[in-house]
Amino acid sequence: MDRLKCPNFFKCRQKEKVTASSENFHVGENDENQERGNWSKKSDYLLSMVGYAVGLGNVWRFPYLTYTNGGGAFLIPYAIMLALAGLPLFFLECSLGQFASLGPVSVWRILPLFQGVGITMVLISVFVAIYYNVIIAYSLYYLFASFQSVLPWANCSSWADENCSRTPIVTGCNVSIGAGEMFMNISWVNTNNLTCLNGSEVFRPGQLPSEQYWDKVTLQRSSGMDETGVVVWYLALCLLLAWLIVGAALFKGIKSSGKVVYFTALFPYVVLLILLIRGATLEGASKGISYYIGAQSNFTKLREAEVWKDAATQIFYSLSVAWGGLVALSSYNKFNNNCYSDAIIVCLTNCLTSVFAGFAIFSILGHMAHISGKEVSQVVKSGFDLAFIAYPEALAQLPAGPFWSILFFFMLLTLGLDSQFASIETITTTFQDLFPKAMKRMRVPITLGCCLILFLLGLLCVTQAGIYWVHLIDHFCAGWGILIAAILEIAGIIWIYGGNRFIEDIEMMIGAKRWIFWLWWRACWFVITPILLSAILVWSLVKFHRPDYADIPYPDWGVALGWCMIIFCIIWIPIMAIIKIVQAEGNILQRIISCCRPASNWGPYLEKHRGERYRDMAEPAKETDHEIPTISGSTKPE
């Protein structure tokens, strides 16, 4: 690195003529695509994809699923579902975005009838971005709270009530009264200075200090969704800080976020390794790992359909397919990038990270069970309960607890941030494709404006009822909508556009392959993956249960609102299909057929990559084509 030179990230202002390239932060001098820009290095792309795929679910959901579904035996259906559902869809989306150099909405020039699928993906990313940054705000709050000599949730402090206890609480017992015995409640026994007879005590479970801290201090949780309460000001400030970090990382688009992910994507692995080494040295660690993936593995669980459904669902959501982000990030690749090897690398990294994280989590939970005299099954949790109750409780009981807490919550922060970067990049990429000239001039204000709007929408999630809203959005928007989009995506591209034609498109990028190479991909794309996704969707609908949080059921209007959110996301699929059909020419059948053909400006973005197959395609970057053009019998390539 040259000395005394401004880094590219903060490029020095010089008196020079402003060019289109200098106006567009996405574009560098050496980029192949001077309109949209490319990743500066392939490692920028790979780390961004790893950061997007590897998120909070790898740490707080996968280990719990493995434990509850047979331990090590769960890895068998997990690996099978990766091969049958996760990897095929992941490879398809990466190839799609890279081939056309377009984001999740404009890429549907491939099949204009299905443009609404892309809109659905972007809307789901918007909803998820709202609540995902709230989780990052929780992590920031706990990170700041950890900078104390004693962790605030280490003991039952002034905020706790009489239920706060690490040991079971005595509710009553038998006492000697005269010549006989009577069962009395413990408050009466204590008031009268009596002593319980040995073995007669009746216990009820207490609430851990970390649990009450989470409910009473962090969330100031209300009694239900009906009681919104006030905005929790310190969570609102943490949410603002989270959005400022996201905005700062994305102000130059992929050129800046591609550098930030070198830290946010790699640092979690350092922390997981440190936590694993520390956990492995603690008493009881081997017991925790045994429950996770060792001698306690139960292979008879493989006979249960629920285990296979959990494996497929975890793979599907963990890889972030059908959110639009994979298409958006891949659209900035150079045309001849080997997206096949990239898909393999990212998918395997994601799955191995999940397994690795489980060892770090369960080694320390095993120690927590050991010192509290409980079984591992009594301390293991999932989701928020693992991240903000069980694991903080375990860390509070370690020597130098604040240090380990700082490491853990900083890891959660970085895990969440790089996933959030990709979600926002999905939104800005959509604007980039629809309004390229405006984005060249106003990328920074548009990006910051997007962050500001999402921050304001997220304030509802940091009220005293905020956690209920977070769960509601997650339960509805991050579920069925994604499954529906994924099924239509693979059906539209493989069954309508044509799987063999799509394979020819891929070979234009990565080179021709022998027929046996595509045998597996054809089997998955044409048959196996759509069937699996459909089965998961049907299963999820059949097994639908009224959402609740902490055993508090959601009100009728809350459930109805959840359905309205998911309908709002997917309604654009039929709406855009109808619009395209109305705009087309001919009778109804001719209109539908014409809308199922690729648009005249579908194909490789740059002319030098089009070859004979796409030599007559219209120019994709023309301003008049910033939306998918109407398909009609009279449409001719320009």
UniProtKB/Swiss-Prot annotation:
Cystine links in this protein are: none
Tissue spec. comment: Expressed in the distal region of the intestinal tract: cecum and colon.
How does it sit in the bilayer?
Multi-pass membrane protein
What segments bear the compositional bias annotation Basic and acidic residues? 618-628
Q: Transmembrane stretches, by residue range?
A: 45-65, 72-92, 110-130, 231-251, 257-277, 311-331, 344-364, 395-415, 453-473, 476-496, 524-544, 559-579
Region Disordered, as annotated, extends over: 618-638
Report the Pfam families cross-referenced here. Answer: SNF
Instruction: Tell me which residues are glycosylated.
Output: N155, N163, N174, N185, N193, N198, N298
| A biological process term (GO) from this entry | beta-alanine transport
Single GO term (MF):
amine transmembrane transporter activity
Report the GO terms under cellular component: apical plasma membrane; brush border membrane; plasma membrane
- Keywords, sorted A to Z: Amino-acid transport, Cell membrane, Glycoprotein, Membrane, Symport, Transmembrane, Transmembrane helix, Transport
**Which residue intervals are topologically Extracellular?**
131-230
Q: Which reaction does it catalyse?
A: glycine(out) + chloride(out) + 2 Na(+)(out) = glycine(in) + chloride(in) + 2 Na(+)(in); L-leucine(out) + chloride(out) + 2 Na(+)(out) = L-leucine(in) + chloride(in) + 2 Na(+)(in); L-glutamine(out) + chloride(out) + 2 Na(+)(out) = L-glutamine(in) + chloride(in) + 2 Na(+)(in); L-arginine(out) + chloride(out) + 2 Na(+)(out) = L-arginine(in) + chloride(in) + 2 Na(+)(in)
Task: Outline what the protein does.
Answer: Amino acid transporter that plays an important role in the absorption of amino acids in the intestinal tract. Mediates the uptake of a broad range of neutral and cationic amino acids (with the exception of proline) in a Na(+)/Cl(-)-dependent manner. Transports non-alpha-amino acids such as beta-alanine with low affinity, and has a higher affinity for dipolar and cationic amino acids such as leucine and lysine. Can also transport carnitine, butyrylcarnitine and propionylcarnitine coupled to the transmembrane gradients of Na(+) and Cl(-).
Q: Which family does it belong to?
A: Belongs to the sodium:neurotransmitter symporter (SNF) (TC 2.A.22) family. SLC6A14 subfamily.
- The protein in question is named Sodium- and chloride-dependent neutral and basic amino acid transporter B(0+)
Q: What is the lineage of its organism?
A: Eukaryota, Metazoa, Chordata, Craniata, Vertebrata
